Curated annotation (Swiss-Prot):
It catalyses: chloride(in) = chloride(out); K(+)(in) = K(+)(out). Ubiquitinated by PRKN during mitophagy, leading to its degradation and enhancement of mitophagy. Deubiquitinated by USP30. Non-selective voltage-gated ion channel that mediates the transport of anions and cations through the mitochondrion outer membrane and plasma membrane. Forms a high-conducting channel with a stable open state and a voltage-induced closure with a mild preference for anions over cations. Involved in male fertility and sperm mitochondrial sheath formation. This is Non-selective voltage-gated ion channel VDAC3.
């Protein structure tokens, strides 16, 4: 079955070149492990260098493959508890049903969503519904694929106000080493991206966005270069003269180090630059 992307994953390759390998202004640690009983644990914590504020989260996941069930529990330092139950590929091939709930013990606030997604060879569909008896918000998206071309639509409808609150379109093309993505959000925000895999070591990306009625055009270019199987360098720059640099090194299997820096090219001597440090551990 063809892996037709969801609407949010359109243009993902270009986004990854811009976003992965950076962690400006923070120290971050990620840990992932799996018990012998099949329970997956993942935890992360980060501290911002400018404010000193620290936060973290913990997630456990258990899969019952014979029944297509996945149970996920989440907790963060804001004392928010989350539970997610998903059922996949059993009622129909490519169909995934999910119940996602959030509970805040300090305030007693509860919220939840019912989610459904369906993927086949040439399309993918999805819908989320807020569990809110005062008037749920309905989210929906669809992506069609044909010979590398991708067309997508995303919407949200506020039933309490009987109003369409989101209305987005996207069009793109995907090949083995090249991707093009364009989108229009609510008829006012326009954007596009180009991803190119030059060879096995070099990936490049260009991003462009602007808003109707404004002269503020956002433009950026990014690149990633693999020095070897363990080391990679990343760099990006935008029209605001913000320069991002990243260095990723696999120290040993399951241990990855990331160093990054954000430089303000317009105020190079004034300071205000940001650095970041990240560790990823997997066992």
């Amino acid at each position: 079955m063809c892996n037709t992307p969801t609407y949010c994953d359109l243009g993902k390759a270009a986004k990854d070149v811009f976003n992965k390998g950076y962690g400006f202004g923070m120290v971050k640690i990620d840990l992932r492990t799996k018990s012998c009983s099949g329970v997956e644990f993942s935890t992360s914590g980060h501290a911002y260098t400018d404010t000193g504020k620290a936060s973290g989260n913990l997630e456990t996941k258990y899969k019952i493959c014979n029944y297509g069930l996945t149970f996920t529990q989440k907790w963060n330092t804001d004392n928010t508890l989350g539970t997610e139950i998903s059922w996949e590929n059993k009622l129909a091939e490519g169909l995934k049903l999910t119940l996602d709930t959030i509970f805040v013990p300090n305030t007693g606030k509860k919220s939840g969503k019912l989610k459904a997604s369906y993927k086949r060879d040439c399309f993918s569909l999805g819908s989320n519904v807020d569990i809110d008896f005062s008037g749920p918000t309905i989210y929906g998206w669809a992506v069609l694929a044909f010979e590398g071309w991708l067309a997508g639509y995303q919407m949200s409808f506020d039933t309490a106000k009987s109003k369409l609150s989101q209305n987005n379109f996207a069009l793109g093309y995907k090949a083995a080493d090249f991707q093009l993505h364009t989108h229009v959000n609510d008829g006012t925000e326009f954007g596009g991206s180009i991803y190119q895999k030059v060879n096995e070591k070099i990936e490049t990306s260009i991003n462009l966005a602007w808003t109707a009625g404004s002269n503020n055009t956002r433009f950026g270019i990014a690149a990633k270069y693999k020095l070897d199987c363990r080391t990679s360098l990343s760099a990006k720059v935008n029209n605001a003269s913000l320069i991002g640099l990243g260095y990723t090194q696999t120290l040993r299997p399951g241990v990855k180090l990331t160093l990054s820096a954000l430089i303000d090219g317009k105020n190079f001597n004034a300071g205000g630059h940001k650095v970041g440090l990240g560790f990823e551990l997997e066992a």
